[in-house]
């Protein structure tokens, strides 16, 4: 049990360190944050000043019906980029939420960049 609590403390410390480094998302440049569960992948764009979610996308959405693999996560990045362009948002702050920048996370960020979003 002690190892689990220590790991949680390290994860929280890592997230806080990343969040302090990247800053807050504002209306001109909101923050896109990532969450991975064992089955699904979630991303949401947040305006931290107001505290609102501006856009979100996940593999759990029925109309997308995607799995949690790199090719499907890249499709999620394209869908999110389209939703952001509809709202005239072209710049984001990328919050990897403590995850390493490889695999799904890197694929998602690459798809956003290829779709024309400045991350």
Curated annotation (Swiss-Prot):
GO terms for molecular function: 5S rRNA binding; structural constituent of ribosome. It holds the Pfam family Ribosomal_L18p. It comes from Borrelia duttonii (strain Ly). GO terms for biological process: translation. Part of the 50S ribosomal subunit; part of the 5S rRNA/L5/L18/L25 subcomplex. Contacts the 5S and 23S rRNAs. Belongs to the universal ribosomal protein uL18 family. Signal peptide: none annotated. Keywords: Ribonucleoprotein, Ribosomal protein, RNA-binding, rRNA-binding. This is Large ribosomal subunit protein uL18.
């Amino acid at each position: 049990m002690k190892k689990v609590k220590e790991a949680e403390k390290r994860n929280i410390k890592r997230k806080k360190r990343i969040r302090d480094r990247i800053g807050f998302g504002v209306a001109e440049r909101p923050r896109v944050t990532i969450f991975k569960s064992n089955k699904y992948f979630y991303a949401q764009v947040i305006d931290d000043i107001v505290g609102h979610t501006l856009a979100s996308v996940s593999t759990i959405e029925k109309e997308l019906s995607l799995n949690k693999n790199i090719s499907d996560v890249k499709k999620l990045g394209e869908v999110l980029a389209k939703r952001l362009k509809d709202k005239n948002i072209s710049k984001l702050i990328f919050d990897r939420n403590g995850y390493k920048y490889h695999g799904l996370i890197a694929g998602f960020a690459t798809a956003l960049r290829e779709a024309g979003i400045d991350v």
